Amino acid sequence: MGAQIILSEGFEVVPPPEMNDLVLFGSNQSVSSCDVSTVTTEDGTVFSGDSSPGGATEEDFPEEKPFSFYFVKQPAYDDPEIKAKIDEAGHEINRYNKDRIVVSNAQESEKAEILSLFGQMKSLVSKSEGYRVVIEEKKMEFDALHESLRNLRCSTSDQLCFSKEELDHLIYIAHYQIEHGSIGFEEEDWVLKETEKADGIVLSEDSLAEKEASINRVKSMAVELNEVKKELDAITWKINHLSDKVGKSQNNLRVLDVKKAHILEERDRSYERIKMLRIQRDKGKAAFYQSLPVMRKARELAASGNVRDLEVFASSEADRFMTQWNDDKAFRDDYVKRISPSLCERQLNQDGRIKDPEVQVVWEKKVPVKGGEKVHETNREDSSSNSSQYGSVITDKRKKETRKKAMDFNRSSAEESDVTDLEFSVYEKPKKEEEEVDEETLKEREREEQLEKARLAMERKRKLQEKAAAKAAIRAQKEAEKKLKECEKKAKKKAAANSSSPSESDHSQEVTKDLEKVRTLAVSGKEKHQKERSLFPKQRSFRYKHRGRGTEALPKAILNRRKAHKYWVWGLSSAALAVALFLVVLLLR
Protein backbone atom coordinates (compact mmCIF):
# COMPACT_ATOMS: atom_id res chain seq x y z
CA MET A 1 0.00 0.00 0.00
CA GLY A 2 1.64 3.23 -1.11
CA ALA A 3 1.20 6.38 0.95
CA GLN A 4 2.54 9.92 0.61
CA ILE A 5 4.84 11.04 3.43
CA ILE A 6 4.10 14.59 4.63
CA LEU A 7 5.61 16.90 7.22
CA SER A 8 3.88 17.74 10.48
CA GLU A 9 6.04 19.79 12.89
CA GLY A 10 9.21 17.87 12.15
CA PHE A 11 7.67 14.34 11.91
CA GLU A 12 7.12 12.07 8.93
CA VAL A 13 3.46 11.05 8.97
CA VAL A 14 1.48 8.80 6.61
CA PRO A 15 -2.07 10.27 6.27
CA PRO A 16 -5.02 7.90 5.81
CA PRO A 17 -6.72 7.98 2.39
CA GLU A 18 -10.05 9.78 1.87
CA MET A 19 -9.73 11.73 5.11
CA ASN A 20 -9.16 15.34 4.10
CA ASP A 21 -10.34 16.79 7.42
CA LEU A 22 -7.73 14.82 9.42
CA VAL A 23 -5.24 16.89 11.40
CA LEU A 24 -2.25 15.16 12.98
CA PHE A 25 -0.71 16.73 16.05
CA GLY A 26 2.88 15.92 16.96
CA SER A 27 4.46 16.56 20.30
CA ASN A 28 5.23 20.12 21.27
CA GLN A 29 8.74 19.14 22.29
CA SER A 30 11.44 19.30 19.64
CA VAL A 31 12.61 15.87 18.55
CA SER A 32 16.11 16.69 17.43
CA SER A 33 17.72 13.39 16.73
CA CYS A 34 14.85 11.04 15.77
CA ASP A 35 13.33 10.51 12.38
CA VAL A 36 9.94 8.87 12.84
CA SER A 37 7.55 7.01 10.58
CA THR A 38 4.05 5.58 11.00
CA VAL A 39 2.21 2.53 9.74
CA THR A 40 -1.35 2.29 8.39
CA THR A 41 -3.79 -0.51 7.79
CA GLU A 42 -5.39 -1.49 4.53
CA ASP A 43 -8.57 0.27 5.62
CA GLY A 44 -6.69 3.54 5.73
CA THR A 45 -6.48 3.91 9.52
CA VAL A 46 -3.28 5.17 11.12
CA PHE A 47 -2.80 3.11 14.30
CA SER A 48 -1.72 4.63 17.60
CA GLY A 49 -2.53 1.94 20.17
CA ASP A 50 -6.16 1.69 21.38
CA SER A 51 -8.17 0.40 18.40
CA SER A 52 -9.35 -3.15 17.92
CA PRO A 53 -8.74 -5.28 14.76
CA GLY A 54 -10.21 -4.34 11.40
CA GLY A 55 -13.61 -6.13 11.83
CA ALA A 56 -15.09 -3.38 14.05
CA THR A 57 -18.45 -1.77 13.35
CA GLU A 58 -19.62 1.80 13.59
CA GLU A 59 -21.31 1.05 16.96
CA ASP A 60 -17.96 0.17 18.53
CA PHE A 61 -16.36 3.34 17.11
CA PRO A 62 -18.84 6.18 17.32
CA GLU A 63 -16.08 8.63 16.44
CA GLU A 64 -13.38 7.60 13.98
CA LYS A 65 -9.99 8.65 15.29
CA PRO A 66 -6.64 7.85 13.69
CA PHE A 67 -4.04 6.18 15.88
CA SER A 68 -0.39 6.81 15.12
CA PHE A 69 2.57 4.75 16.23
CA TYR A 70 5.97 6.33 15.76
CA PHE A 71 9.00 4.17 15.01
CA VAL A 72 12.57 5.37 14.96
CA LYS A 73 13.73 5.49 11.37
CA GLN A 74 17.27 4.45 10.56
CA PRO A 75 18.04 6.14 7.23
CA ALA A 76 20.68 4.82 4.91
CA TYR A 77 23.91 6.78 5.14
CA ASP A 78 26.77 6.72 2.69
CA ASP A 79 30.05 7.80 4.22
CA PRO A 80 31.49 10.44 1.85
CA GLU A 81 35.04 9.23 2.47
CA ILE A 82 34.17 5.62 1.61
CA LYS A 83 32.14 6.79 -1.36
CA ALA A 84 35.05 8.88 -2.62
CA LYS A 85 37.40 5.91 -2.23
CA ILE A 86 34.98 3.62 -4.10
CA ASP A 87 34.65 6.17 -6.90
CA GLU A 88 38.42 6.50 -7.07
CA ALA A 89 38.84 2.72 -7.25
CA GLY A 90 36.17 2.57 -9.97
CA HIS A 91 38.03 5.21 -11.98
CA GLU A 92 41.22 3.19 -11.55
CA ILE A 93 39.48 0.05 -12.82
CA ASN A 94 38.17 1.96 -15.85
CA ARG A 95 41.66 3.26 -16.54
CA TYR A 96 43.13 -0.24 -16.22
CA ASN A 97 40.46 -1.59 -18.57
CA LYS A 98 41.33 1.06 -21.14
CA ASP A 99 45.03 0.26 -20.79
CA ARG A 100 44.26 -3.44 -21.17
CA ILE A 101 42.31 -2.75 -24.37
CA VAL A 102 45.21 -0.69 -25.74
CA VAL A 103 47.70 -3.44 -24.89
CA SER A 104 45.44 -6.10 -26.42
CA ASN A 105 45.16 -4.11 -29.64
CA ALA A 106 48.94 -3.73 -29.72
CA GLN A 107 49.32 -7.47 -29.20
CA GLU A 108 46.93 -8.22 -32.03
CA SER A 109 48.80 -5.86 -34.37
CA GLU A 110 52.12 -7.47 -33.43
CA LYS A 111 50.70 -10.95 -34.02
CA ALA A 112 49.33 -9.89 -37.42
CA GLU A 113 52.71 -8.45 -38.36
CA ILE A 114 54.46 -11.68 -37.29
CA LEU A 115 52.03 -13.74 -39.41
CA SER A 116 52.65 -11.52 -42.45
CA LEU A 117 56.41 -11.83 -41.97
CA PHE A 118 56.12 -15.61 -41.69
CA GLY A 119 54.13 -15.66 -44.95
CA GLN A 120 56.82 -13.65 -46.75
CA MET A 121 59.52 -15.90 -45.33
CA LYS A 122 57.62 -19.00 -46.48
CA SER A 123 57.42 -17.76 -50.09
CA LEU A 124 61.11 -16.80 -50.07
CA VAL A 125 62.11 -20.17 -48.64
CA SER A 126 60.24 -21.97 -51.45
CA LYS A 127 62.04 -19.77 -54.01
CA SER A 128 65.41 -20.46 -52.41
CA GLU A 129 64.71 -24.21 -52.52
CA GLY A 130 63.97 -23.94 -56.25
CA TYR A 131 67.19 -22.04 -56.87
CA ARG A 132 69.15 -24.62 -54.90
CA VAL A 133 67.70 -27.41 -57.08
CA VAL A 134 68.69 -25.49 -60.22
CA ILE A 135 72.20 -24.96 -58.88
CA GLU A 136 72.57 -28.66 -58.14
CA GLU A 137 71.49 -29.55 -61.66
CA LYS A 138 73.87 -27.00 -63.19
CA LYS A 139 76.68 -28.31 -61.06
CA MET A 140 76.01 -31.85 -62.24
CA GLU A 141 76.07 -30.72 -65.88
CA PHE A 142 79.21 -28.73 -65.32
CA ASP A 143 80.94 -31.68 -63.70
CA ALA A 144 79.96 -33.95 -66.61
CA LEU A 145 81.34 -31.46 -69.16
CA HIS A 146 84.48 -31.00 -67.18
CA GLU A 147 84.99 -34.74 -66.97
CA SER A 148 84.47 -35.20 -70.70
CA LEU A 149 86.93 -32.40 -71.40
CA ARG A 150 89.47 -33.97 -69.13
CA ASN A 151 88.98 -37.34 -70.79
CA LEU A 152 89.37 -35.67 -74.15
CA ARG A 153 92.61 -33.88 -73.29
CA CYS A 154 94.47 -36.37 -71.16
CA SER A 155 93.11 -39.87 -71.42
CA THR A 156 96.60 -41.33 -71.99
CA SER A 157 100.02 -39.96 -72.72
CA ASP A 158 99.98 -41.25 -76.32
CA GLN A 159 96.59 -39.87 -77.19
CA LEU A 160 97.27 -36.30 -76.06
CA CYS A 161 95.69 -33.70 -78.21
CA PHE A 162 97.67 -30.45 -78.52
CA SER A 163 96.92 -27.30 -80.37
CA LYS A 164 99.16 -25.90 -83.12
CA GLU A 165 100.66 -23.19 -80.91
CA GLU A 166 101.50 -25.75 -78.20
CA LEU A 167 103.24 -27.98 -80.67
CA ASP A 168 105.26 -25.10 -82.10
CA HIS A 169 106.32 -24.15 -78.62
CA LEU A 170 107.41 -27.70 -77.80
CA ILE A 171 109.39 -27.91 -81.05
CA TYR A 172 111.11 -24.64 -80.26
CA ILE A 173 112.11 -25.90 -76.82
CA ALA A 174 113.41 -29.13 -78.22
CA HIS A 175 115.56 -27.36 -80.83
CA TYR A 176 116.91 -25.00 -78.20
CA GLN A 177 117.95 -27.86 -75.97
CA ILE A 178 119.60 -29.57 -78.85
CA GLU A 179 121.58 -26.47 -79.76
CA HIS A 180 122.60 -25.32 -76.30
CA GLY A 181 122.14 -28.29 -74.01
CA SER A 182 124.26 -31.37 -73.32
CA ILE A 183 121.84 -33.93 -74.64
CA GLY A 184 123.25 -37.02 -76.39
CA PHE A 185 122.41 -38.31 -79.83
CA GLU A 186 120.02 -40.95 -78.51
CA GLU A 187 118.05 -38.42 -76.58
CA GLU A 188 118.02 -36.12 -79.56
CA ASP A 189 116.64 -38.96 -81.63
CA TRP A 190 113.96 -39.59 -79.01
CA VAL A 191 112.97 -35.95 -78.95
CA LEU A 192 112.81 -35.94 -82.71
CA LYS A 193 110.67 -39.04 -82.63
CA GLU A 194 108.33 -37.38 -80.12
CA THR A 195 108.05 -34.35 -82.30
CA GLU A 196 107.31 -36.48 -85.26
CA LYS A 197 104.55 -38.24 -83.27
CA ALA A 198 103.13 -34.91 -82.36
CA ASP A 199 103.13 -33.85 -85.98
CA GLY A 200 101.04 -36.87 -86.68
CA ILE A 201 98.52 -36.03 -83.94
CA VAL A 202 98.04 -32.41 -85.05
CA LEU A 203 96.48 -33.56 -88.20
CA SER A 204 93.25 -34.65 -86.22
CA GLU A 205 91.02 -31.49 -86.45
CA ASP A 206 87.83 -33.18 -85.11
CA SER A 207 89.23 -33.57 -81.63
CA LEU A 208 90.19 -29.87 -81.57
CA ALA A 209 86.67 -28.71 -82.51
CA GLU A 210 85.11 -30.92 -79.89
CA LYS A 211 87.44 -29.50 -77.32
CA GLU A 212 86.55 -25.89 -78.18
CA ALA A 213 82.81 -26.68 -78.05
CA SER A 214 83.13 -28.26 -74.62
CA ILE A 215 85.14 -25.25 -73.36
CA ASN A 216 82.47 -22.80 -74.53
CA ARG A 217 79.77 -24.89 -72.92
CA VAL A 218 81.66 -24.90 -69.62
CA LYS A 219 82.04 -21.09 -69.73
CA SER A 220 78.33 -20.55 -70.36
CA MET A 221 77.47 -22.94 -67.54
CA ALA A 222 79.74 -21.01 -65.16
CA VAL A 223 78.02 -17.70 -66.02
CA GLU A 224 74.58 -19.21 -65.39
CA LEU A 225 75.73 -20.65 -62.08
CA ASN A 226 77.03 -17.25 -60.95
CA GLU A 227 73.68 -15.58 -61.73
CA VAL A 228 71.73 -18.23 -59.87
CA LYS A 229 74.05 -17.91 -56.86
CA LYS A 230 73.54 -14.12 -56.76
CA GLU A 231 69.76 -14.52 -56.76
CA LEU A 232 70.03 -17.16 -54.03
CA ASP A 233 72.19 -14.83 -51.89
CA ALA A 234 69.62 -12.01 -52.25
CA ILE A 235 66.83 -14.34 -51.17
CA THR A 236 68.82 -15.56 -48.15
CA TRP A 237 69.53 -11.91 -47.14
CA LYS A 238 65.80 -11.12 -47.29
CA ILE A 239 65.01 -14.21 -45.23
CA ASN A 240 67.55 -13.19 -42.57
CA HIS A 241 66.15 -9.62 -42.50
CA LEU A 242 62.61 -10.94 -42.06
CA SER A 243 63.74 -13.30 -39.30
CA ASP A 244 65.28 -10.32 -37.43
CA LYS A 245 61.97 -8.46 -37.72
CA VAL A 246 60.14 -11.51 -36.42
CA GLY A 247 62.50 -11.66 -33.42
CA LYS A 248 61.87 -7.98 -32.59
CA SER A 249 58.12 -8.45 -32.90
CA GLN A 250 58.26 -11.47 -30.62
CA ASN A 251 60.23 -9.44 -28.03
CA ASN A 252 57.63 -6.67 -28.22
CA LEU A 253 54.92 -9.29 -27.79
CA ARG A 254 56.60 -10.62 -24.65
CA VAL A 255 56.88 -7.07 -23.23
CA LEU A 256 53.19 -6.48 -23.95
CA ASP A 257 52.31 -9.76 -22.24
CA VAL A 258 54.20 -8.67 -19.10
CA LYS A 259 52.52 -5.25 -19.20
CA LYS A 260 49.10 -6.82 -19.60
CA ALA A 261 49.75 -9.16 -16.67
CA HIS A 262 50.76 -6.16 -14.51
CA ILE A 263 47.62 -4.24 -15.53
CA LEU A 264 45.41 -7.22 -14.72
CA GLU A 265 47.11 -7.60 -11.35
CA GLU A 266 46.54 -3.93 -10.50
CA ARG A 267 42.92 -4.21 -11.65
CA ASP A 268 42.39 -7.24 -9.42
CA ARG A 269 43.81 -5.25 -6.49
CA SER A 270 41.37 -2.43 -7.23
CA TYR A 271 38.53 -4.96 -7.33
CA GLU A 272 39.60 -6.31 -3.95
CA ARG A 273 39.78 -2.79 -2.54
CA ILE A 274 36.28 -2.04 -3.83
CA LYS A 275 35.01 -5.25 -2.23
CA MET A 276 36.54 -4.29 1.12
CA LEU A 277 35.14 -0.76 0.88
CA ARG A 278 31.68 -2.08 0.03
CA ILE A 279 31.84 -4.43 3.00
CA GLN A 280 32.82 -1.46 5.17
CA ARG A 281 29.96 0.58 3.69
CA ASP A 282 27.50 -2.25 4.37
CA LYS A 283 28.74 -2.40 7.96
CA GLY A 284 27.95 1.30 8.25
CA LYS A 285 24.46 0.58 6.88
CA ALA A 286 23.89 -2.27 9.33
CA ALA A 287 21.46 -0.19 11.38
CA PHE A 288 19.43 0.60 8.25
CA TYR A 289 19.28 -3.07 7.28
CA GLN A 290 18.25 -3.99 10.84
CA SER A 291 15.44 -1.42 10.78
CA LEU A 292 13.92 -2.88 7.60
CA PRO A 293 12.50 -6.05 9.25
CA VAL A 294 11.22 -3.89 12.13
CA MET A 295 9.24 -1.71 9.73
CA ARG A 296 8.06 -4.79 7.82
CA LYS A 297 6.77 -6.38 11.00
CA ALA A 298 5.04 -3.13 11.98
CA ARG A 299 3.28 -2.97 8.60
CA GLU A 300 2.20 -6.59 8.95
CA LEU A 301 0.75 -5.92 12.40
CA ALA A 302 -1.04 -2.82 11.11
CA ALA A 303 -2.42 -4.74 8.14
CA SER A 304 -3.70 -7.51 10.41
CA GLY A 305 -5.29 -4.97 12.77
CA ASN A 306 -3.46 -6.20 15.86
CA VAL A 307 -3.30 -2.85 17.61
CA ARG A 308 -2.20 -3.98 21.06
CA ASP A 309 0.72 -5.99 19.72
CA LEU A 310 1.62 -3.04 17.53
CA GLU A 311 1.56 -0.74 20.55
CA VAL A 312 3.75 -3.09 22.58
CA PHE A 313 6.10 -3.51 19.67
CA ALA A 314 6.39 0.26 19.14
CA SER A 315 7.05 0.92 22.84
CA SER A 316 9.66 -1.85 23.02
CA GLU A 317 11.47 -0.49 19.97
CA ALA A 318 11.38 3.02 21.42
CA ASP A 319 12.75 1.78 24.76
CA ARG A 320 15.48 -0.16 23.02
CA PHE A 321 16.48 2.89 21.01
CA MET A 322 16.52 5.14 24.08
CA THR A 323 18.67 2.71 26.07
CA GLN A 324 21.19 2.65 23.24
CA TRP A 325 20.97 6.42 22.94
CA ASN A 326 21.62 6.97 26.65
CA ASP A 327 24.35 4.36 27.09
CA ASP A 328 26.47 4.53 23.94
CA LYS A 329 28.03 7.79 22.75
CA ALA A 330 29.21 6.19 19.51
CA PHE A 331 25.61 5.23 18.75
CA ARG A 332 24.48 8.82 19.33
CA ASP A 333 27.16 10.24 17.05
CA ASP A 334 26.36 7.68 14.36
CA TYR A 335 22.64 8.42 14.51
CA VAL A 336 23.19 12.19 14.38
CA LYS A 337 25.40 11.65 11.35
CA ARG A 338 22.69 9.54 9.70
CA ILE A 339 19.85 11.91 10.48
CA SER A 340 21.55 15.13 9.27
CA PRO A 341 20.74 14.63 5.53
CA SER A 342 17.07 13.97 6.36
CA LEU A 343 16.95 17.09 8.52
CA CYS A 344 18.44 19.10 5.68
CA GLU A 345 15.81 17.75 3.30
CA ARG A 346 13.02 18.87 5.63
CA GLN A 347 14.69 22.25 6.33
CA LEU A 348 15.16 21.47 10.04
CA ASN A 349 17.92 22.21 12.49
CA GLN A 350 19.49 19.55 14.70
CA ASP A 351 17.22 20.55 17.57
CA GLY A 352 14.09 19.95 15.45
CA ARG A 353 13.24 23.58 14.77
CA ILE A 354 12.61 24.89 11.29
CA LYS A 355 15.52 26.70 9.73
CA ASP A 356 15.61 30.45 9.31
CA PRO A 357 14.92 31.22 5.62
CA GLU A 358 17.33 34.16 5.77
CA VAL A 359 20.23 31.81 6.43
CA GLN A 360 21.90 30.84 3.18
CA VAL A 361 22.14 27.08 2.75
CA VAL A 362 25.35 26.43 0.83
CA TRP A 363 27.50 23.34 1.38
CA GLU A 364 29.45 23.20 -1.82
CA LYS A 365 30.89 26.70 -1.50
CA LYS A 366 33.35 26.97 1.32
CA VAL A 367 34.35 30.34 2.72
CA PRO A 368 38.13 30.84 2.33
CA VAL A 369 39.82 31.74 5.62
CA LYS A 370 42.76 34.09 5.45
CA GLY A 371 45.38 33.36 8.04
CA GLY A 372 47.31 36.61 7.75
CA GLU A 373 44.63 39.09 8.80
CA LYS A 374 45.69 41.98 10.99
CA VAL A 375 44.25 42.24 14.50
CA HIS A 376 42.56 45.56 15.25
CA GLU A 377 43.38 47.51 18.37
CA THR A 378 41.29 46.99 21.50
CA ASN A 379 40.06 50.57 21.62
CA ARG A 380 38.62 50.34 18.13
CA GLU A 381 37.03 47.01 18.96
CA ASP A 382 35.31 48.56 21.99
CA SER A 383 33.90 51.42 19.93
CA SER A 384 32.76 49.12 17.10
CA SER A 385 31.09 46.70 19.57
CA ASN A 386 29.15 49.55 21.19
CA SER A 387 28.00 50.89 17.84
CA SER A 388 26.93 47.47 16.50
CA GLN A 389 24.61 46.66 19.42
CA TYR A 390 21.78 48.80 18.06
CA GLY A 391 21.82 47.12 14.66
CA SER A 392 21.79 43.65 16.21
CA VAL A 393 18.57 44.40 18.18
CA ILE A 394 16.73 45.34 14.98
CA THR A 395 17.99 42.30 13.10
CA ASP A 396 16.87 39.99 15.97
CA LYS A 397 13.34 41.41 15.76
CA ARG A 398 13.22 40.87 12.03
CA LYS A 399 14.51 37.32 12.43
CA LYS A 400 11.73 36.47 14.87
CA GLU A 401 9.10 37.83 12.48
CA THR A 402 10.50 35.87 9.54
CA ARG A 403 10.62 32.69 11.65
CA LYS A 404 6.93 33.00 12.51
CA LYS A 405 6.05 33.51 8.85
CA ALA A 406 8.16 30.52 7.84
CA MET A 407 6.46 28.29 10.45
CA ASP A 408 3.00 29.24 9.12
CA PHE A 409 4.11 28.74 5.53
CA ASN A 410 5.63 25.31 6.23
CA ARG A 411 2.49 24.14 8.07
CA SER A 412 0.24 25.20 5.19
CA SER A 413 2.39 23.80 2.39
CA ALA A 414 3.60 20.62 4.11
CA GLU A 415 1.38 18.34 2.01
CA GLU A 416 2.61 19.81 -1.28
CA SER A 417 6.33 19.78 -0.54
CA ASP A 418 8.24 16.82 -1.91
CA VAL A 419 11.95 17.27 -1.31
CA THR A 420 14.17 15.04 -3.44
CA ASP A 421 17.47 16.91 -3.69
CA LEU A 422 19.96 16.31 -0.89
CA GLU A 423 21.53 19.53 0.40
CA PHE A 424 24.23 19.92 3.00
CA SER A 425 23.74 23.07 5.02
CA VAL A 426 26.46 25.49 6.02
CA TYR A 427 25.35 28.40 8.14
CA GLU A 428 26.71 31.72 7.01
CA LYS A 429 26.20 35.10 8.57
CA PRO A 430 23.23 36.93 7.02
CA LYS A 431 24.03 40.04 5.05
CA LYS A 432 23.46 43.27 6.95
CA GLU A 433 20.76 45.33 5.31
CA GLU A 434 20.97 49.06 5.19
CA GLU A 435 18.72 50.22 7.98
CA GLU A 436 17.17 53.59 8.54
CA VAL A 437 18.36 54.99 11.86
CA ASP A 438 16.52 57.67 13.83
CA GLU A 439 18.07 60.97 14.85
CA GLU A 440 18.01 60.01 18.53
CA THR A 441 20.05 56.87 17.89
CA LEU A 442 22.51 58.89 15.82
CA LYS A 443 22.91 61.43 18.62
CA GLU A 444 23.34 58.63 21.12
CA ARG A 445 26.04 57.05 19.00
CA GLU A 446 27.87 60.37 18.58
CA ARG A 447 27.70 60.99 22.32
CA GLU A 448 29.11 57.54 23.05
CA GLU A 449 31.89 58.05 20.53
CA GLN A 450 32.81 61.38 22.17
CA LEU A 451 32.81 59.75 25.60
CA GLU A 452 35.02 57.00 24.28
CA LYS A 453 37.43 59.53 22.79
CA ALA A 454 37.54 61.49 26.07
CA ARG A 455 38.20 58.30 28.00
CA LEU A 456 41.04 57.38 25.66
CA ALA A 457 42.54 60.88 25.97
CA MET A 458 42.40 60.73 29.79
CA GLU A 459 44.04 57.33 29.73
CA ARG A 460 46.84 58.61 27.49
CA LYS A 461 47.32 61.65 29.76
CA ARG A 462 47.44 59.43 32.86
CA LYS A 463 50.04 57.19 31.28
CA LEU A 464 52.22 60.18 30.35
CA GLN A 465 51.99 61.58 33.89
CA GLU A 466 52.89 58.20 35.36
CA LYS A 467 55.93 58.00 33.10
CA ALA A 468 57.04 61.54 34.06
CA ALA A 469 56.61 60.85 37.80
CA ALA A 470 58.55 57.61 37.51
CA LYS A 471 61.38 59.38 35.69
CA ALA A 472 61.48 62.14 38.36
CA ALA A 473 61.59 59.59 41.17
CA ILE A 474 64.41 57.71 39.50
CA ARG A 475 66.33 60.93 38.95
CA ALA A 476 65.92 62.00 42.61
CA GLN A 477 66.98 58.56 43.79
CA LYS A 478 70.12 58.71 41.65
CA GLU A 479 71.02 62.15 43.02
CA ALA A 480 70.51 60.93 46.58
CA GLU A 481 72.70 57.93 45.93
CA LYS A 482 75.43 60.16 44.53
CA LYS A 483 75.32 62.39 47.61
CA LEU A 484 75.40 59.36 49.89
CA LYS A 485 78.42 58.06 48.05
CA GLU A 486 80.25 61.36 48.39
CA CYS A 487 79.44 61.53 52.10
CA GLU A 488 80.72 58.01 52.65
CA LYS A 489 83.97 58.87 50.90
CA LYS A 490 84.42 61.93 53.11
CA ALA A 491 83.64 59.87 56.21
CA LYS A 492 86.26 57.30 55.24
CA LYS A 493 88.87 59.99 54.85
CA LYS A 494 88.05 61.50 58.24
CA ALA A 495 87.96 58.14 59.98
CA ALA A 496 91.75 57.81 59.53
CA ALA A 497 92.39 60.70 61.93
CA ASN A 498 92.02 60.03 65.69
CA SER A 499 90.71 63.43 66.76
CA SER A 500 88.40 65.81 64.96
CA SER A 501 88.10 69.60 65.26
CA PRO A 502 84.74 71.36 65.98
CA SER A 503 84.64 72.70 62.42
CA GLU A 504 84.81 69.16 61.11
CA SER A 505 81.98 68.07 63.42
CA ASP A 506 79.87 70.94 62.11
CA HIS A 507 80.61 69.82 58.60
CA SER A 508 79.56 66.26 59.40
CA GLN A 509 76.31 67.58 60.89
CA GLU A 510 75.64 69.49 57.65
CA VAL A 511 76.27 66.33 55.66
CA THR A 512 73.78 64.36 57.76
CA LYS A 513 71.19 67.12 57.30
CA ASP A 514 71.70 66.98 53.54
CA LEU A 515 71.23 63.22 53.58
CA GLU A 516 67.99 63.58 55.53
CA LYS A 517 66.75 66.18 53.01
CA VAL A 518 67.54 63.87 50.10
CA ARG A 519 65.69 61.02 51.77
CA THR A 520 62.65 63.19 52.45
CA LEU A 521 62.67 64.35 48.82
CA ALA A 522 62.73 60.75 47.59
CA VAL A 523 59.89 59.77 49.94
CA SER A 524 57.82 62.81 48.92
CA GLY A 525 58.37 61.95 45.21
CA LYS A 526 57.08 58.44 45.78
CA GLU A 527 54.04 59.70 47.71
CA LYS A 528 53.29 62.21 44.97
CA HIS A 529 53.51 59.45 42.37
CA GLN A 530 51.08 57.31 44.38
CA LYS A 531 48.65 60.24 44.75
CA GLU A 532 48.70 60.86 41.00
CA ARG A 533 47.95 57.21 40.40
CA SER A 534 45.02 57.43 42.83
CA LEU A 535 43.71 60.59 41.09
CA PHE A 536 43.68 58.83 37.71
CA PRO A 537 42.47 55.30 38.38
CA LYS A 538 43.59 52.89 35.73
CA GLN A 539 40.71 51.58 33.67
CA ARG A 540 40.59 48.01 32.50
CA SER A 541 42.59 47.43 29.37
CA PHE A 542 42.12 44.54 26.97
CA ARG A 543 45.82 44.02 26.45
CA TYR A 544 47.05 41.41 28.87
CA LYS A 545 50.77 40.92 29.18
CA HIS A 546 51.60 37.98 31.38
CA ARG A 547 55.12 38.46 32.68
CA GLY A 548 56.77 36.60 35.47
CA ARG A 549 57.46 38.74 38.56
CA GLY A 550 60.99 38.49 39.87
CA THR A 551 62.91 40.32 42.57
CA GLU A 552 63.21 44.05 41.98
CA ALA A 553 66.69 45.01 40.82
CA LEU A 554 68.63 47.30 43.14
CA PRO A 555 70.05 50.57 41.81
CA LYS A 556 73.58 50.50 40.47
CA ALA A 557 74.91 53.05 42.98
CA ILE A 558 73.80 50.91 45.95
CA LEU A 559 75.48 47.86 44.46
CA ASN A 560 78.71 49.80 43.93
CA ARG A 561 78.53 51.10 47.52
CA ARG A 562 78.20 47.58 48.87
CA LYS A 563 81.14 46.43 46.79
CA ALA A 564 83.30 49.38 48.01
CA HIS A 565 82.42 48.64 51.65
CA LYS A 566 83.43 45.02 51.22
CA TYR A 567 86.74 46.00 49.61
CA TRP A 568 87.52 48.39 52.52
CA VAL A 569 86.87 45.70 55.16
CA TRP A 570 88.94 43.12 53.35
CA GLY A 571 91.75 45.60 52.84
CA LEU A 572 91.98 46.45 56.57
CA SER A 573 91.91 42.79 57.58
CA SER A 574 94.61 41.86 55.07
CA ALA A 575 96.81 44.76 56.28
CA ALA A 576 96.45 43.63 59.91
CA LEU A 577 97.40 40.08 58.97
CA ALA A 578 100.45 41.31 57.07
CA VAL A 579 101.63 43.37 60.10
CA ALA A 580 101.16 40.36 62.40
CA LEU A 581 103.14 38.11 60.09
CA PHE A 582 105.91 40.71 59.87
CA LEU A 583 106.16 40.90 63.67
CA VAL A 584 106.26 37.10 63.97
CA VAL A 585 109.10 36.92 61.46
CA LEU A 586 111.07 39.58 63.39
CA LEU A 587 110.61 37.75 66.68
CA LEU A 588 111.74 34.44 65.20
CA ARG A 589 114.99 36.03 64.01
Curated annotation (Swiss-Prot):
InterPro entries from the UniProt entry: PPI1-4
Location(s) in or outside the cell: Cell membrane; Endoplasmic reticulum membrane
GO biological process, one term: regulation of proton transport
Coiled-coil segments: 205-245, 431-500
Gene Ontology CC annotations of this record: endoplasmic reticulum membrane; plasma membrane
Domain of life: Eukaryota
Chief localization: membrane
Bilayer-crossing regions: 568-588
Positions of the UniProt region annotated as Disordered: 370-450, 485-534
Bias (Basic and acidic residues) ranges: 370-383, 395-408, 426-450, 504-534
Protein topology in the membrane: Single-pass membrane protein
Keywords in alphabetical order: Cell membrane, Coiled coil, Endoplasmic reticulum, Membrane, Transmembrane, Transmembrane helix
Tissues expressing the protein: Expressed in seedlings and flowers.
Family note: Belongs to the plant Proton pump-interactor protein family.
Cited function: May regulate plasma membrane ATPase activity.
Protein name, as recorded: Proton pump-interactor 2
Gene: PPI2
